[in-house]
Amino acid sequence: MNDDYEMRYYELTRERFGLSYDVDMLVDSGRLYLSTFYNQYDDEELRWKDEYGKLGLIDGTDTATGMQTDRMRHDAETRVRYETRTLSAVTFGFEGNVGGWGIDPMLSYSFAEEDDSDNADVTFRMDQKDTVGNIDWSNPQQVIITPTDLSIYDPAQLKFKELEITENVSKDSELAFSINAEKETDFGIFKMGFKSKNREKDVDDYIIVYEAETTMADFDPQTLDWRIPGQTFSPQANPDLIYGLRDQLDSLDVDFSDSLSRDFVTEEKVNAVFIQNTYSWDKGVVVAGMRYEDTSTDSSAFDQDGNVVLASSDHSFFAPSVNVKFFLTDQWTLRGAIWRGLSRPGFKKTAPKLDYKDDDGDISGSAGNPDLKPYEATNYDLSLEFYGDDMTFVSIGLFRKDIENAIYPKIYKTATFLGVTFNDDVETWENADDSTIDGLELNLQYGWENGIYFAGNITLTDGESTFSPADGMSFTTPFRKLADEAANISLGYDKGPWDIRLAANYRSDYLDWLSDEGDDIDDVSENNSRFVDSYMQIDLTAKYKISDSTELKFEAVNMGNEEEYYYWGDESQLSQYDLFGRNYSVGFTYKF
């Protein structure tokens, strides 16, 4: 097993405020419109973490169901966080006819900000180097760790290790312009368009760590009834007192500060053009076109010494597409498509930046990869559909995806990035060579006159990716985060003011990581790869329409109290076990 084990408890409160305003004005040749919206999310989070690290195996004590350890480094961590996220956008456009062409020019601006600068995170530590502890994994989903010396739980023995304060403000802005024009000709409806998008992401991430000579006993220790029977969750510091340390920073000693290494700015410019023609006749429709886009990205960040690090990339993408719909009868339709798709990596993955932590000489973290390429796919789709009376619908579909540059996380046990030598794992990202996904999809929907309806869907897939490390060897893995089986079944009632839906959603297990914290990706195997176990969730949604403007809504999520389980290689090797509980909400919508 890994040499550390941790339990976490979360309390999260979220408040959301949203406002939208739209204006339409009719003119001689069409319609002018202005659309605006503003959303604000305020999160309040408490996290208690109870961690036992540096677990050393006593020779000869390991069995199929447990082991004994001769060392436990106990960390009890209390984190309090208040975060505000805002998102606003304004769009101005026109839709109408000019010179026989239908046009729709649009100019938009959006701005998002995430402010996570109001927080406090304190770790208390006790290191028992000569005390035996027992670890029982007879139930691999609920491992039990039992120290023989209970003083490891004593708040007076848990010394104040550090107070970590972070000030993270992330700003994301985008200015976009697009215009499309279409005209009906003898060969169908011809359409062409242009879009230009300029986006900037600016992350200012400051961290400062303080020390103090005190123990948890001075912070009103709290106890928690843990959900796993037989397992003790250590006392934790009062979150109000932890957050109150923000008013006492002048009395604390600064141990470490970093105002640069996590900062970065990325600017992305995308220009795209397309042409498309839609041809229809009594037996079908053919839509054919092509799209070309050019993307340039410029990033700046800092190395360990505060020197500016620059990175740039340019990428062009050509995407032809053909979509065919053929009406076999009034009720049967055959569809086929060949098209290209593109997905760009996130800015945090491509910026030349570091995010690292030094824990008494154990340096871990993550590093961006400016050489990361966008994910490209050629897609093939074929389906047969039946449209019956009312809600009756049946379909069967086949699909294939030929993928280039699929993006995977990669873990190095030791490596050096931007002058920082990591010796306790560093995560970065890497492109695979070629990947393929083949799939089959079945859909069924049927409704009765009394308002009751049934819907079901099942998708079967088979995907894999190929890697070629620097040593010239190659290996193949399952496609990441792709479940071989996925299905959902819904039973509902939709008539009059009532809209009720009971749904069950299922997926099989899938690959999450290619290697664990002790192995590099070049040594990948099933035993050191992380998987997510199969999962089924049952949800209920009920809506009642009081009037045209007012609607009541009730939601029950995860009614079966399903847990999420992650494991290394096989289900007997725990990686992570999450209990979310059931969630209920009541709300109403009013339109005016």
Identify the residue ranges that each predicted region occupies:
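Gram-negative outer-membrane beta-barrel transporters
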Residues: 400-402, 414, 419-517, 555, ...
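Outer-membrane beta-barrel signature, preferentially recognizing the C-terminal barrel domain
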Residues: 72-87, 262-269, 342-395, 400-403, ...
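Transmembrane beta-barrel wall of Gram-negative outer-membrane proteins
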Residues: 1-54, 75, 83-93, 99, ...
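Signature of Gram-negative outer-membrane beta-barrel scaffolds
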Residues: 4-6, 39-45, 159-164, 168, ...
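Transmembrane beta-strands of outer-membrane beta-barrel pores
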Residues: 27, 38-42, 86, 98, ...
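Hydrophobic, lipid-facing positions within transmembrane beta-strands of outer-membrane proteins
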Residues: 15-21, 86-92, 173-179, 269-275, ...
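C-terminal beta-signal and adjacent terminal beta-strands/loops
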Residues: 506-522, 543-592
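Repeated loop/turn-to-beta-strand initiation elements of outer-membrane beta-barrel proteins
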Residues: 29-32, 100-103, 187-190, 283-286, ...
